[in-house]
Every structure is written in structure tokens, then in C-alpha cells.
Amino acid sequence: ELVTADGEVVRTSEQEHPDLFWALHGGGGNFGVVTSFTFRLHELPQVTVALLLSPPEAGPEVTRAFRDVVESGPDELSGGVLYLTAPEEEFVPEHLVGKLACLTVVTYAGPEAAAREAMRPLLELGFEGEMVMEMPYAELQCALDDPPGYRVYWSAENLSSLPDEAVDRFTDRAADLLAPSPSQHVLFAQGGAMARGNPDFPVPWRTAPWVVHPFGLWEDPADDDRVRQWVRDVCADVRPWSMDAVYLNFLTDPDPDRMVAALGEANYGRLTEVKRRYDPDNVFHLNHNIAPR
């Protein structure tokens, strides 16, 4: 259910306003204000999470090992590699606190014993900091929420493959991350069930097996240019493997060409037609905008 630009309350489904229902599955906030929705959930009360910390120089080896484990593992296995400022946590060695480090976060939709077996080749590398635990899925979901009060700039590239050269491009650029800061330089796995959803919806990015997602969080305006350029450089480095399509929420300031690439040219054409039908005056424009034709 949503309120359209002319104040009408509209219910959408595959049978009611199916064009609008389609557009709302990936087209962002361009078509109205959603007031309620119904969706299907899968019960997953507990997950297993491994936090594996390394010095930054170990990043290339760790990233390759993580890639190999995920690509050969079951759908239940996922996660990412993050370069970040190491926090003061129980599993973090004192000599790494406050310094740039490489954190591998492995997630498993199942019990710890099965998780350890699935990621065994990765664990055999040995890490300076290690913690494996079961936790509620909801707790994992909010574990990497951004802290409030910071300046923010981020982007992403969805990769169709992750060869060794792409790993090197990703890990090399970590040296330019602003540290100490809450900024993070992230590579995470997709695929699995998400890649097998309805292919008709305008979310072509979800078939990508890998995502590179640099995001800057900083306080001093004097660092604005440095952080923004770092984000752009990261994306440029891995663009040879990019499929162009990308999750809109990962784009800070997309230009029109990037919007078309993010959604796919055919999808973008359909979305502009829906926009013209429900918001011809572009009332909803303070967003990742799709202009009406």
C-alpha cells in the first residue's frame, strides 16, 4: 500500500496495479510513500558467525582463501572481508587496536559445528584474533550499522567474477583507507538463493557473486576530497570485472548514466514509463531519481 503523488492510496500486487508492483521491487522511492507491505519470511532464529582478524599484509592470502571456501561451499556459507580500524574487543590483540587490520566475517545459516566444517580450510590459515559464536540473526543484521554523526560517502561495484587480479586490486587499495576512522573497505559474497529470485524484477545486480563496497565515515571536512577520491578509486580499480548493475542504496551520488547502468537499460525504460504514469511532475525526486519521460 502506498500514497501516490496525487494523494491517492493505492494497493499493489501481481493482480492490482501490476506495473507499479513491479517498479517497487527495485525502483527506489520514486513512486510514492509506502505505508504498509506484506512479505514472506524464512525462519532463521540462529546463525553462526566467525570473526577472524589479521594484519593488513595478510589480506591477499586471506581474501583468496575466503573466496575459495565460499565458492566451493554450500548456500548457507557467506560473509565478507573487511579492512577497517581494529576495535577494542576481546578477540583483538592489543597491538592491532586502533590500526588498520583485515577482518574476515564468515556467516553460516546453521549450527557452529557445521559452520566450522564448512570453513575449515580458512580456519587452518591461523589468525591473530579469532571468535566463533552462534547468535540471533537479528543481532547479526544490525552488527555493522553505521555510527551516527559522521560524514558519509560510499559506492559499490557488483562483480561477475573474482580472479586473483581482482583480489589484488581490492587489497592494494586498502592502504589508502582513512584510519583510524569508522571507514571500511568491504568485499562480500552474494549468490545463493538471492540469485535465484524472480528475474523479471528490476534488480539485475543480485545475480552477481561478489560485491566490492568501499564506504567512508569521517568527521573532519578537510578529509572530504581524500575520502571521496578513495571511494572512486576503489570502484575504478575493480571495474574491469563489474557487471555495472548495482544496488541503488550503495550509490551516494549517481549520475543519470550510472542509474541506467545500475538498473539495466530495459528496466530503466519500463521504470520511467511507470514514473510518468504515477508521478508525472517528479514530486518524489529527492532520491536516486528516475525522471518521468
Region spans (language model):
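Soluble FAD-dependent oxygen oxidases
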Residues: 1-293
